[in-house]
């Protein structure tokens, strides 16, 4: 069929689309957004009830209430009927107060690195719910008092979007990890791209389309050097050394970039692989394992040793009522043994609904997504995070206690005493 003929002076489709894009971008620039991209969605973090704070800190609500009455520690906000609530910043102030007033339990209240403890760098391999896992792990660690840096290595900025940072797919200049690892004269310190988040003690290096430029640069070097492995991953290691003293944990959320993923593997002290207990996902996960061994072989061929303190697997999107999934988990347990975490993260409408609201469950109260679903999801999330924190504790030579604490509590987002009208 011949193309329809149009008058010479009629605007072509491609020209109209170009005009649309230019016009909309001009409006965005006029509002001052384009110059700040990736820019955060303006939102605030809710306060936490006294019952929630008691669970997070592992103390009783009556003890916290008495501290408030005695004027000790931060002053909580008083709401309806005198109910007390604390910001996350105030929770961390409470940590410092409790650590100083109860020195024998200082590590419980203030679990940050001590002298001689190495920075924990956890690489979360791209897979089922891996971005969500990175998101909840980073926020969960921050709620427990750790200083956390989350790094989005996805050129689509998936993790960044969860934190409220949006780049619209544009390769914004030096706004991602690319700034710290690029090969040209525009290389900057990683500090220049670290952004705040809603969570006190949790920072983010956003992802951006410019990360794909790094992949292209590495590919050209790889080919031009007769397939000798370039120093792409050692650049990641060097960049993180700049902020070694500033954080306790770094969470590297991997995307689909090969060289960036290799960098995450070399920099990591531990690796976390997510897997959904369905056969196609298990096959895909197995491919990721072969990719890991391939990347490590290339790095070691370049004369650098790759060592990890742990390599763990986490079952995500688990439906415990699905018999076939239970069989798949049992099948995985045989070859993986203790490397497969005991906790699983359940398939959850609450997590999906929170995502639809552009929030995490930690940012919402139970009434926002349904109390029963909320509490169930929080229990599975907190159980998985507790296992990972116990692994970190063992690496630092500490006795693990997070799993036992999680088993005694309800959820970090649920205050059972408050629901009975007791927490004020």
What is the meaning of each model-derived region?
Residues 208, 317-324, 328-364:
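Beta-strand-loop-alpha "switch" segments that mediate conformational coupling across diverse proteins
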Residues 187-200, 206-262:
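Cytosolic-facing regulatory segments adjacent to core modules
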Residues 144-150, 156-206, 342:
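Phosphate-binding loop that captures ATP/GTP phosphates
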Residues 354-384:
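C-terminal boundary of histidine-terminating zinc-finger modules
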């Amino acid at each position: 069929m011949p193309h329809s003929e149009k008058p010479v002076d009629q605007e072509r489709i491609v020209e109209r689309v170009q005009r649309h894009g230019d016009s909309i971008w001009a409006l965005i620039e006029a509002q001052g957004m384009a110059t700040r991209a990736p820019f955060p969605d303006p939102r605030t973090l809710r306060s936490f009830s006294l019952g929630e704070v008691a669970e997070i800190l592992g103390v009783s609500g009556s003890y916290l209430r008495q501290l408030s009455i005695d004027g000790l520690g931060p002053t909580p906000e008083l709401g309806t009927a005198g109910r007390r609530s604390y910001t996350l910043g105030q929770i961390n102030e409470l940590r410092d107060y409790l650590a100083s007033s109860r020195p024998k339990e200082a590590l419980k209240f203030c679990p940050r690195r001590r002298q001689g403890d190495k920075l924990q760098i956890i690489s979360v391999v791209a897979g089922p719910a891996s971005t969500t896992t990175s998101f909840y792990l980073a926020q969960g660690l921050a709620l427990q008092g750790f200083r956390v840096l989350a790094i989005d290595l996805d050129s689509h900025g998936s993790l960044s979007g969860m934190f409220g940072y949006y780049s619209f797919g544009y390769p914004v200049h030096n706004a991602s990890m690319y700034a710290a690892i690029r090969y040209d004269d525009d290389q900057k310190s990683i500090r220049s791209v670290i952004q705040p988040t809603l969570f006190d003690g949790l920072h983010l290096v956003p992802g951006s389309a410019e990360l794909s430029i790094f992949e292209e640069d590495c590919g050209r070097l790889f080919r031009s050097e007769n397939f000798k492995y370039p120093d792409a991953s050692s650049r990641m290691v060097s960049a993180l050394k700049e902020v070694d003293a500033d954080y306790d944990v770094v969470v590297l959320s991997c995307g689909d970039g090969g060289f960036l993923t290799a960098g995450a593997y070399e920099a990591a002290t531990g690796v976390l692989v997510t897997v959904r207990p369905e056969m196609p996902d298990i096959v895909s996960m197995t491919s990721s394992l072969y990719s890991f061994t391939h990347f490590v072989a290339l790095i070691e061929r370049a004369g650098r040793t790759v060592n990890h303190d742990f390599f763990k697997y986490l079952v995500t999107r688990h439906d415990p009522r699905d018999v076939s999934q239970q069989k798949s988990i049992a099948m995985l347990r045989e070859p993986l043994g203790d490397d497969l975490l005991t906790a699983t993260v359940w398939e959850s409408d609450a997590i999906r609904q929170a995502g639809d609201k552009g929030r995490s469950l930690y940012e919402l109260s139970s009434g926002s997504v349904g109390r029963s679903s909320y509490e169930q999801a929080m229990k599975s999330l907190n159980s998985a995070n507790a296992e990972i924190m116990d692994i970190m504790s063992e690496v630092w030579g500490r006795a693990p206690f997070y799993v036992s604490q999680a088993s005694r509590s309800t959820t970090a987002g649920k205050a059972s005493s408050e629901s009975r009208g007791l927490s004020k």
